[in-house]
Curated annotation (Swiss-Prot):
Native organism: Mus musculus (Mouse)
The keyword Membrane appears for this protein: yes
LXXIL motif, short sequence motif: residues: 697-701
Protein name (Swiss-Prot/TrEMBL): Phosphatidate phosphatase LPIN2
Tissue: Expressed at high level in liver and to some extend in lung, kidney, placenta, spleen, thymus, lymph node, prostate, testes, small intestine, and colon. Expressed also in circulating red blood cells and site of lymphopoiesis.
Region (N-LIP): 1-108
The keyword Nucleus is annotated on this UniProt entry: yes
Amino acid sequence: MNYVGQLAGQVLVTVKELYKGINQATLSGCIDVVVVRQQDGSYQCSPFHVRFGKLGVLRSKEKVIDIEINGSAVDLHMKLGDNGEAFFVEETEEEYEKLPAYLATSPIPTEDQFFKHIETPLVKSSGNERPAQSSDVSHTLESEAVFTQSSVKKKKRRRKKCKQDNRKEEQAASPVAEDVGDVGVSSDDEKRAQAARGSSNASLKEEDYKEPSLFHSGDNYPLSDGDWSPLETTYPQAVCPKSDSELEVKPSESLLRSEPHMEWTWGGFPESTKVTKRERYDYHPRTATITPSENTHFRVIPSEDSLIREVEKDATVEDTTCTIVKPKPRALCKQLSDAASTELPESPLEAPQISSLLDADPVPSPSAEAPSEPKPAAKDSPTKKKGVHKRSQHQGPDDIYLDDLKALEPEVAALYFPKSDTDPGSRQWPESDTFSGSQSPQSVGSAAADSGTECLSDSAMDLPDVTLSLCGGLSENGEISKEKFMEHIITYHEFAENPGLIDNPNLVIRIYNRYYNWALAAPMILSLQVFQKSLPKATVESWVKDKMPKKSGRWWFWRKKESMIKQLPETKEGKSEVPPANDLPSNAEEPTSARPAENDTSSDEGSQELEESIKVDPITVETLSHCGTASYKKSLRLSSDQIAKLKLHDGPNDVVFSITTQYQGTCRCAGTIYLWNWNDKVIISDIDGTITKSDALGQILPQLGKDWTHQGIARLYHSINENGYKFLYCSARAIGMADMTRGYLHWVNDKGTILPRGPLMLSPSSLFSAFHREVIEKKPEKFKIECLNDIKNLFAPSRQPFYAAFGNRPNDVYAYTQVGVPDCRIFTVNPKGELIQERTKGNKSSYHRLSELVEHVFPLLSKEQNSAFPCPEFSSFCYWRDPIPDLDLDDLA
């Protein structure tokens, strides 16, 4: 009995350790890579499938993956996605190339970019500056300290605050006040503002609420991987609303990130398979109250129910609608302190008024768009403590209409356009020069797009804001003023009564503050509406030269550039100067060419004022123009030039992918890169049921120390490899079992003979989905056909690299046939060890007997020849051998 007890205990311990190793939350793995040297000296490679487990919450710098090949670090890095997948980042070839949301990403931060913001000196300030500028300095100081451990702890404390009772929140000191500089608000007001924000945040369930990152980069990539870009600021990033008048909060999709619901195909990226199309159509979005951020600049008009819940401090979520309405222009407060102390009107709108806003005409009513003037509230007012939406302390003094920003002073305007405010949710017109120095051309959704979840809105599919006017003036040398344009603006009723206005020679179409005639604007709008694609930039430029009336050359500057330039620091003499390119905020690193072609003819608002107000140094302009509107996309493959820099040698090359985190140390994934030639011959071998005796037990028993390998297979494979053939091991196991499977192949030993080394091709999908597909569904051929076809395409198109294949099921035979393996060299083995050739199924053999015929079935590959038998059916063994002599049966009798 003691024997049995010890054996059972050993088995339990082994199984427990095995489970720890295959836990899907901690699985990390790397699929081997095949690089094929072509006849012309170029290279092609299979995808780099690398996955790290349990690394979901990392900072931007901790998402950079280092690569070592043959023990030496290489100048090549990968980036970590939301689901632990690694990918390369490459710049798009075309400036306005349209990318799917799941492919767009941000560039990999480098060491210089990571520490550049910390080493940037503070901007010199003049003695007569306003006291409110101290808040800007505090913002800078906090942004320089974003990498400290204290800031991480403060962020955790803020998360815990949302879970506490709201009464305690009113009495507790706000930890956020330590992170963000005061903007002329008293401490009592700040506490009440924090309490109001806490009650609003508490109305969302914990799993439905995703706190916006406090530190976001000025180089804003809306389709990033849920990470932060190199340069950090203290402003949260805006999300992409569904529309300008309504914001709907979708239910939590956190489960989509969990392992069993992610589908990862060969050569692709992880995609969610939990939400079906039917579920999407049947889904009714829930709405919740929100707190306005500095990126929206809209007034929030909540429903009556949400206000009652805030008064009662109830943290439950109900089906209420939160409507955002653009305010009308109003007078700006003269003093910054007065403006900072203002707040929203206390009287909420009734529910019928809110519902009418949703069904209103495109021309809003005055009652909906003209909120009452904000009044300075007394510090001890008891009504301020209840039911009032306080402004976020990240925001400026008050909401303001965008057209009124021209009258602001630079330090006041900076409060409305912080350094990170690149407006990722705004629509972008393709031929325009984007605002952010390295922003992706598509401004859609959120960081969750990389994990396969849906974006709230794809603004690249929306039409731009188009305004019609009969002001004329495109054929004149003078500029089109905004007053003149608005004076002759065409309303909907006028256009409905007389659509022939498009033939009027004075018709001017304004598209994002640029003016065009109908001949040019029509194809641009039509292309976006019909094909959901923008016209190429080259086409638009040539179209402008042909269709627009000629004018004198001038600079193309956008209105956002004007507000950006006004934010540039002033010297003591009061003159604007442009700092060096490396010290510019990300908003100042313009992606556009500062001086266009001389025949640029489209008009732009406010350009004359810019030319008069600032003189840009030519060297700086040239530096900015070379920044380019570069957008970046994910990739799993390297180019031929990148592969050449790796300095691979023929055969296996050990590669290690490592990522270092502050709390988890260094995590490594080891694999192998195999360099083959274009004329190599490859033998395909399955693992489960082919090398092992069965599919299911072959994955479990070897981990318990039990040898479950077919006898004679190691010697057969070794003999075939000595004749010059390459081996490729293809299994439908999951990528998380790569190390386990690779270790098993090295562990197989048949009286001193081991299996030859070869690339291990596994499924990049999850552990349980791969196990279910291979063992339960018994359909591993789906993955194998995709994988083997991809490997086949790496070789010359006219060549067949696969010489023979070994499997154990009809599914394997079907997959091998689909990739071009001759059926005369497809072998299957059953659990008894009987080897069957597909062409002659009645003839059963074994691995031992086939080893005796290796020289005939797998002849030695000559170095001078590309293959042993170009036509194997006419080989000396099958055709060119001496015929059997005729025998006289009478003599034998």
